[in-house]
């Protein structure tokens, strides 16, 4: 009877080992995906960060990159701990899983909170940023971001093209008789911003605020979904690890 129980325990341990190994392979790929989403946000979608008053959007992307790297390292460690049957490595693996779980939950919560606050932040700060920093020395990032925003989303001004009348760049005379930046034009040519007409200038209801808000909210949904989704999957990893740890402990007695 004792021999049967021993074989049963050994069989259970082997099953858990292969289950955890399969999980770690999938987990490593998930880490790659998490890191890719973070890098994608930073590298391709960071042009508009200079237009945001809060650094929350940037922080969520950095958290995902860090979490992705740690996930990939943890996945390799998990495979080693599983096949070497080292309980101390399993303990370390569990702790790392817990840390990653918390990081991704934090990223998901930050994305959700910022999602709720985004509209208020843009209404309070975007117009001020555009009219005070556009084409001003030391704010080249804002200038490039505004030009790209207006061209990519076919909008002009924070709320509408009339916002540019309050621009320090326009009022200072440096705009060379322009009433709006050239990036407001449907067909951009040098000096096209001197003529504010519907046939020439983008007239979008809600202005660039609504366009930028929709853009960022879409990416916040991706960041939040990835963070929370992978965190939920990690719960299974922690359960498998605890089961294998307990199984190895029983075999030593």
Curated annotation (Swiss-Prot):
It comes from the Eukaryota. It is a multi-pass membrane protein. Keywords: Cell membrane, Glycoprotein, Lipoprotein, Membrane, Palmitate, Transmembrane, Transmembrane helix, Ubl conjugation. Residues 1-18, 79-91, 243-253 are cytoplasmic. GO terms for cellular component: basement membrane; cell surface; plasma membrane. The keyword Cell membrane applies. A lipid is attached at residues 11, 15, 242-243 (S-palmitoyl cysteine). GO terms for biological process: cell migration; positive regulation of cell migration; positive regulation of endocytosis; T cell proliferation; wound healing, spreading of cells. It comes from Rattus norvegicus. This is CD151 antigen. Residues 40-57, 113-221 are extracellular. Belongs to the tetraspanin (TM4SF) family. Its main location: membrane. InterPro entries: Tetraspanin/Peripherin, Tetraspanin_animals, Tetraspanin_CS, Tetraspanin_EC2_sf. The chain crosses the membrane at residues 19-39, 58-78, 92-112, 222-242. It is found in: Cell membrane. CDD domains: CD151_like_LEL. Interacts with integrins ITGA3:ITGB1, ITGA5:ITGB1, ITGA3:ITGB1 and ITGA6:ITGB4 and with CD9 and CD181. Interacts (via the second extracellular domain) with integrin ITGAV:ITGB3. Interacts with ITGA3; this interaction modulates ITGA3 glycosylation pattern. Interacts with F11R. Interacts with RAC1 and CDC42; these interactions mediate physical association of RAC1 and CDC42 with integrin adhesion receptor complexes. Glycans are attached at residue 159. Signal peptide: none annotated. Structural component of specialized membrane microdomains known as tetraspanin-enriched microdomains (TERMs), which act as platforms for receptor clustering and signaling. Plays a role in various cellular and molecular mechanism through its association with both integrin and non-integrin proteins. These interactions facilitate critical cellular functions, including cell-to-cell communication, wound healing, platelet aggregation, trafficking, cell motility, and angiogenesis. One of its GO terms (molecular function) is integrin binding. Palmitoylated. Palmitoylation by ZDHHC2 regulates CD151 expression, association with other tetraspanin family proteins and function in cell adhesion. Ubiquitinated by RNF128 on lysine residues present in the tetraspanin amino terminus via 'Lys-48'-linked ubiquitin leading to proteasomal degradation.
């Amino acid at each position: 009877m004792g021999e049967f129980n021993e074989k049963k325990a050994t069989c259970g341990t082997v099953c858990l080992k292969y289950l955890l190994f399969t999980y770690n392979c999938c987990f490593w790929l998930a880490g790659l995906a998490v890191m890719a989403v973070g890098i994608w946000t930073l590298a391709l979608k960071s042009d508009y960060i200079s237009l945001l008053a809060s650094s929350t959007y940037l922080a969520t992307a950095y958290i995902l990159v860090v979490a992705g790297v740690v996930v990939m390292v943890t996945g390799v460690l998990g495979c080693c701990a599983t096949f070497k049957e080292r309980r101390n490595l399993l303990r370390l693996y569990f702790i790392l899983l817990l840390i990653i779980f918390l990081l991704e939950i934090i990223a998901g919560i930050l994305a959700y909170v910022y999602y709720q606050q985004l509209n208020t932040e843009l209404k309070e700060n975007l117009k001020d940023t555009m009219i005070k920093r556009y084409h001003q020395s030391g704010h080249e990032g804002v200038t490039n971001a505004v030009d790209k925003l207006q061209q990519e989303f076919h909008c002009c001004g924070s709320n509408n093209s009339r916002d540019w009348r309050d621009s320090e760049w326009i009022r200072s005379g440096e705009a060379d008789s322009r009433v709006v930046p050239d990036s407001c034009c449907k067909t951009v040519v040098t000096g096209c911003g001197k003529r504010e007409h519907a046939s020439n200038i983008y007239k979008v209801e809600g202005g660039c605020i609504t366009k930028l808000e929709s853009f960022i909210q879409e990416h916040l949904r991706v960041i939040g979904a990835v963070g929370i989704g992978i965190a939920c999957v990690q719960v299974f990893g922690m359960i498998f690890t605890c089961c294998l740890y307990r199984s190895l402990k029983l075999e030593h007695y």
